Amino acid sequence: MPKSTVRPGAEIVGESAALKEVLEIAQIVARSNSPVLLRGESGTGKEFFAKLIHDSSSRHEKPFVKLNCAALSAGVLESELFGHEKGAFTGATSQKEGRFELAHGGTLLLDEIGEISAEFQAKLLRVLQEGELERVGGTRTLKVNVRLVCATNKDLETAVAAGEFRADLYYRINVVPITLPPLRQRDGDIPRLAQKFLQRFNRENGRSLSFAPATLDILSKCEFPGNIRELQNCTQRTATLARSDVIVPQDLACEQGRCYSPILKKAVAEQVGKGAIHGLARGETESMGQPCDVGVFAAETVMGQSGLIGRERLEQAMATAGWVQAKAARLLGRTPRQVGYSLRRHGIERKVF
C-alpha cells in the first residue's frame, strides 16, 4: 500500500491560539508511548486528535483502531476488546479477534471511557497492567502491544470520588491529559470551519454555494454548545435550505427558529441557559432581535459540585502554572472555566501564592 502523503492532522481546521496550543501538545505527546486521556466537551474533535497522535508517532504505519464504549454492556465490551473463541457464548459461531489484537503495534482509542461499568473496569485494568489477555471462552494468553488513547467528556475525578470509577484505572489512563478547547474559546475558527463544511457540501451535492460576509459574522458570534458537530449540522442544514448561491443571514436556520427540536431545545436551555439556544453569546439576540433572557454564563450556576476542584489540588496547580488558569487547567485535566469556577467557590485569590 502506498504511503499516505496527507499531513497528520490535516483534517483539523483552525488558526486560533487555543487550537495551536493543544496541537503542539499532541505533537509532543506523539513522540512517546504514554497513555493519553483526551478531555473536553462533546463535539470538540477528540477522535481527530487521537488520529493525529497516532499519525505523528512511530506507530503510524500500524493500525489505528477505535471503539466507542458508551451504552455497551460488560459482556459486549469484553468480546469487542478481547475477542472470543467459537462457541464461547450463544451466537459465537466463529472465532473473533478483539480490538486489542487488531491494534497490536498501533494505537487503540477508547472513546467514552467514563461510561464503562465497574465490572469491566477491573478486567480492562488487568490487560493494561500486564499487556496480555485471553479471548472470551479461550485459555491461550495473548501478548498485546498498543498505545492507548482514551477520550471522555465526563468528570472522572468526581466519578472516582463517588466510587463509580476505579482510582487505579484512572491513574493508568490519565498519564497525559489533554483538554480540547470548546469552539467558543477558539477565536476566529468558526468561519474557517463553516467554510470547510460548506466546501464539503458543495462537493457532495454539485453546488457552488458561498457565505455572505454578514452571515459569517453572525455565525462567529454564536457559542455553539454542541461545538464542531453542531456547527457542521448548522452549516449543512442552512446550505440545504439556502434560497440562492449566496447564503445570507435570512437563510440561517437559527434566524428561522429551526435550530433545535423542542426536546433538544429544552435540554440545552436547562444546561447552559436560555441565552445559549443555538449558542448566542450573552448580550447578543435571538432570531427576532429580542434580548436573551439568561446569559450563557449562567451555565456556571448549574455546574454544581461536579466541576469543583479540591482546594489544595487547585492551589498547587495554580502555583505551578504561575497563576495562568489555562496552564493550570491542562495540569489538572480540566477546562479553564472549571478552574475559574473553583477559584471563586474556594475564594482563592492570587495573593495566596
UniProtKB/Swiss-Prot annotation:
Keywords: Activator, ATP-binding, DNA-binding, Nitrogen fixation, Nucleotide-binding, Plasmid, Transcription, Transcription regulation, Two-component regulatory system
Residues holding ATP: 40-47, 103-112
GO biological process, alphabetically ordered: nitrogen fixation; phosphorelay signal transduction system
GO molecular function, one term: sequence-specific DNA binding
The Sigma-54 factor interaction domain, residue ranges: 12-240
NCBIfam families noted in UniProt: nifA
Job of this protein: Required for activation of most nif operons, which are directly involved in nitrogen fixation.
Designated name of the protein: Nif-specific regulatory protein
The organism of origin for this protein: Rhizobium leguminosarum bv. trifolii
